[in-house]
Amino acid sequence: MGQKIHPYGLRLGITSEWRSRWYADKQYADYLAEDIKIRDFLSKGLERAGIADVVIERTRDRVRVDIHTARPGIVIGRRGAEADRIRGKLEKLTGKQVQLNILEVKNVDASAQLVAQSIAEQLSNRVAFRRAMRKAIQGAMRQPQVKGIKVVCSGRLGGAEMGRTERYHEGRVPLHTLRAEIDYGTFEAHTTFGRIGVKVWIYKGDVVGGRRESLINARDDRGSRRGRNDRPRRGGGRRRRAAEQKQEG
C-alpha cells in the first residue's frame, strides 16, 4: 500500500501536518473548493517562483496563506507590488481579508517539490532525462538530512514513439514505515513530444518522539566530538595483557 498511496496523506498526524488548518460544519465543501482554487492560482501564476508548499489557515473573518518559495523576490516583486497583486486576487477569490506570508526555502535540494520542478524544467529545455535525474539525485544526497531519494520520470522520454517509465534511486526510501519522514513532490514537463511526469520521494530519517532521527544523530555526533574522554587510551590493551600475564605467573 505504501508504494501506491500518497506518502503525505498516509502519515497525516504521525510525521506530517495538515496543509489546510480550519474547522467548518456546513461550509466544509465551500472552504475545500476555495483551498483548491487558491493552490491552483498560486501554482499556475507563480510557476517561476519555485513554490514548495502552500499552507492555508482560516479564522472566522480572515484567511492566512503561507507561501514557501525558493525565490521570494519573484513573489514579493518590486516594492511589494507583486505581493499586493496576489493578496488582492486572493481577497477577491475568498471574499475575506487575506494575510500573506512569504517564507524562503533555503535548502532547495532537500525539497521534493522543488527537485521535481527542477527536473521538469531541464526536460522542457531538452536536457537528457538521465542526466537531469542523476544530477538531482547527486545534489539531494549531498544534504546532511537526506537519507535517500527516488526519482521517477514517465512519458515519451527522449522523444521515443512509445512512452515508458524510468526510475532511479539512491539510499533508503522506506515507503511502508509510518514513522519515516517522506517528502513527496510531482511536476509536469511540457515538451514538443508531449507531457512528461516527474515524481520525487525524499527520505529524511525517522521521527522519534517528535524529533527527526537525523537531527538527533547529528547532535550526538557533535557531542561525541566535543567530549573525547570516553575514547580508550592507546596502549591500554597491551598493559592489561601484561598485567594478566604477571598474575598468571
Swiss-Prot record:
SMART domains associated with the record: KH
A GO CC term assigned to this protein in UniProt: cytosolic small ribosomal subunit
One example of a Gene Ontology biological process annotation: translation
Assembly, per entry: Part of the 30S ribosomal subunit. Forms a tight complex with proteins S10 and S14.
Domain (KH type-2) ranges: 38-106
MF-aspect GO terms: mRNA binding; rRNA binding; structural constituent of ribosome
Family as reported in the entry's similarity comment: Belongs to the universal ribosomal protein uS3 family.
Lineage: superkingdom: Bacteria
Pfam families assigned: KH_2 (PF07650), Ribosomal_S3_C (PF00189)
Ribosomal protein found in the keyword field: yes
NCBIfam families noted in UniProt: rpsC_bact (TIGR01009)
Organism: Corynebacterium kroppenstedtii (strain DSM 44385 / JCM 11950 / CIP 105744 / CCUG 35717)
Protein task: Binds the lower part of the 30S subunit head. Binds mRNA in the 70S ribosome, positioning it for translation.
Annotated segments matching region Disordered: 218-249
Protein name, as recorded: Small ribosomal subunit protein uS3
Gene giving rise to this polypeptide: rpsC
Cited InterPro entries: KH_dom, KH_dom-like_a/b, KH_dom_type_2, KH_sf_prok-type, Ribosomal_S3_C_sf, Ribosomal_uS3_bac-typ, Ribosomal_uS3_C, Ribosomal_uS3_CS
UniProtKB keywords: Ribonucleoprotein, Ribosomal protein, RNA-binding, rRNA-binding
Biased composition (Basic and acidic residues): 218-233
